[in-house]
Amino acid sequence: MKIERMYARGAEYQRFETLKRNREKRTRQKLAFMEGVQMVEQAIRHNWEFAAMAVADGRRLSGWAEDMIAKAKPEILYQMEEGMHADLSDREESCEIVALVRERTDGLERIEEKASESSMPPLYAVFDRPASPGNLGTFLRSADAFGGTGVIVTGHAADFYDPQCIRASVGTVFAIPFTEMPSAEGALEWLHARPEKPLIVGTSAHGTKNLDEIDLTGPVALAIGNETFGLSRAWKDGCDVLAKIPIFGAASSLNAGSAATVCFYEISRQRLAKGLK
């Protein structure tokens, strides 16, 4: 591991800043900016590669930070001027470590691999055209919490590696397999070809059945739609059933991330009630 001091806002510092805010640069360089205890721990636990880590020069590192650096083995460790380090953080009190992690593409293969390894019926979590990185992060977090096999986004979507997504996911973006597909048609074709033949459940305020009226104990693909427009016509036509969540307040629907969490919980509840673990 190479160690360098950084006291000027030159090219290397600007790289941290740019990767934090610019999706195109993240995609081109295959690098993502991250900070936060849980995010760092999850990335290390799941064997992601660190291109760089940065700590504040002159600040005594905690045992946790020293342990994380030793486990991560970043290609380079920057000892950064304290004010510069603080400026990279969106937190009131900056995390000891900010980092650049190498992006990786899981593809459908890793989702298929996880499905074949699990004793539970697969749960494929689909988010159609998510616009908000925060909602995408919440979706990842909830899918992981309630036994999701993998996450698939379709169409033009928010960036998995946006710092807001990473933060909202509490690092589960590094734990659960995920992939992007350009169209609903491609995702539906893949789901229909799966040997376990999952029930494809879409969500809609105008669904034909309440969520809890559907048997969700077998293989399931759950599709959540865009925050404003809901599921695309292709998804609505391709689903086996459209489910609705009964709500009784003034709002006609839930936030996409909240709706997904309710759905994932109901799937988990039914499976636990049937003794599936």
Report the location of each language-model feature.
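Boundary-proximal intrinsically disordered activation/regulatory segments immediately upstream
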Residues: 1-64, 157-159
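Short acidic-hydrophobic, aromatic-tinged amphipathic segments that line or gate anion-handling sites
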Residues: 4-7, 76-81, 177-186
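Amphipathic alpha-helical repeat scaffolds
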Residues: 36, 131-138, 254-258
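RNA substrate-binding interface of SAM-dependent RNA methyltransferases
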Residues: 45, 100, 105-207
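A glycine-rich helix N-cap at a beta->alpha junction
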Residues: 68-90, 179
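Structured adenosyl-cofactor binding patch, chiefly the S-adenosyl-L-methionine
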Residues: 99, 142-146, 160, 164-173, ...
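Active-site/ligand-binding-proximal alpha/beta "capping" segment
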Residues: 201-251
